[in-house]
Amino acid sequence: MAGLEAIKYGRGRLEVLDQLRLPHEFVYDNVSTCEEAFDSIKSMRVRGAPAIAIVAALALAVELHHEKDGSKTKQEAVQYINKRLDYLLGSRPTAVDLSNAIKLLKRVSQSAAEATNALDDSAACADVRKGYIDAAEKILEDDLTTNLAIGRYGAEYLRRQQMPIGGEEDDEDPSKFFTTSPPCTQGAPDRTYRKLSVLTHCNTGSLATSGHGTALGIIRSLHKMNYLDHAYCTETRPYNQGSRLTAFELVYEKIPSTLITDSMAGALFARMKESKNISAVIVGADRVARNGDTANKIGTYSLAVLAKAHNIKFIVAAPTTSIDLETVSGADIKIEDRAPTELTQISGAVVGKDGHVDVNTTARVAIAHQGIDVWNPSFDVTPSMYIDAVITEKGEVVRSSKGTFDFKTIMPERWAQQVEGKELSAETNVKAHVDDGTQFPMENI
């Protein structure tokens, strides 16, 4: 998506878009240390599970590129990397992408130290740094590829829900059978099918990833493939990622869209499901447990219950890095609580009497009594019984008739290693399998 990037990176330099200033200002912060990355993540200037992991990984890569570790031996270099990664983990404990990236990068660094043939300590340290930097940059590169695949699989999954298996299913261009013109009955003699409308929550697009997005990536793909009628997005209180960021991305891409408050979803489904063919709620995930329970932005659980009540598909879009096979269920997921002021106060650009938005003047105002007690969890956990499918870069995993999700089908090696406790096969050991399915040669691991 040209012109809209949350992360700008070149070896030795990292810039992160300050998303708290959107949609009115484009300001990139230079991030040259792990402390600056930690602050960007904690303050939510950067957010979204994939983007958080990428920024954390690349911030340390920038430090290492400039040799800020000051290591004298390869062992010191590994110790420095591990210490800095442990520090970064505390910036957003709920996001499994961050913990997965940290585990990978620790393995990479240790393996680089063991594999180096350098004859002096300085060169050995350089090999460890290079091993880390290469792996961190690969995380950035792979994320975009992953998101494009999620978008494609998700769009095709939803298309199949609209178009029964039949002659046109095998047509080279199924989009020509989709229309927004009612009345239009599936399977009608003219072989036309309703374009679908969807609802999304929070922000899961280019601003939350390296590009394209996960849940919003599916919406982008639906639009590009001519299957989409309309996209609805929630404001996503209390941080308003939907109104500030998702609405901004949808308008930027000229995708037909409407913003609603979080509490309007039930009314939207009741009044407009049939007329707009609202077919799915699509959300992202900060962590998916082994049984399919999903931690995501607060308000996701409510939407899932409403979707089930209205017989609307509830779809989770997430890379396999967000699937945590070591966490058995949502009961084991740590939920982050945030500051009470996020509910009781709000900031924004000042609107003049003429309706003009003055981006150079911001104000913070109180919207609740400052003495009220506040409970402000950043995430909730949606039980797997409310989720119809999890869309990943390897395809969809659909809830079975028994109410279970079989992630083993898309991650057999990880399942064997982390769930069954089996050793990877000799063939798999030739290439080490990282959490997102990307394979690195063993010498780089």
Swiss-Prot record:
Main location: cytoplasm
Domain of life: Eukaryota
Spans through the membrane: none
Pfam families listed in its UniProt record: IF-2B (PF01008)
Subcellular location(s) of the protein: Cytoplasm; Nucleus
InterPro entries on file: IF-2B-related, IF-M1Pi, IF_2B-like_C, Initiation_fac_2B_a/b/d, M1Pi_N, NagB/RpiA_transferase-like
Record bears the keyword Isomerase: yes
Active site (UniProt): 286
Catalytic activity as recorded in UniProt: 5-(methylsulfanyl)-alpha-D-ribose 1-phosphate = 5-(methylsulfanyl)-D-ribulose 1-phosphate
EC number of this enzyme: 5.3.1.23
Signal peptide: none
EC supergroup of this enzyme: isomerase
Site (Transition state stabilizer): 202
Keywords: Amino-acid biosynthesis, Cytoplasm, Isomerase, Methionine biosynthesis, Nucleus
One Gene Ontology term, aspect cellular component: cytoplasm
Pathway field: Amino-acid biosynthesis; L-methionine biosynthesis via salvage pathway; L-methionine from S-methyl-5-thio-alpha-D-ribose 1-phosphate: step 1/6
Record GO biological process: L-methionine salvage from methylthioadenosine
Molecular-function GO terms, alphabetical: S-methyl-5-thioribose-1-phosphate isomerase activity
Function: Catalyzes the interconversion of methylthioribose-1-phosphate (MTR-1-P) into methylthioribulose-1-phosphate (MTRu-1-P).
Family: Belongs to the eIF-2B alpha/beta/delta subunits family. MtnA subfamily.
Name recorded for this polypeptide: Methylthioribose-1-phosphate isomerase
Organism, scientific name: Sclerotinia sclerotiorum (strain ATCC 18683 / 1980 / Ss-1) (White mold)
Gene: mri1
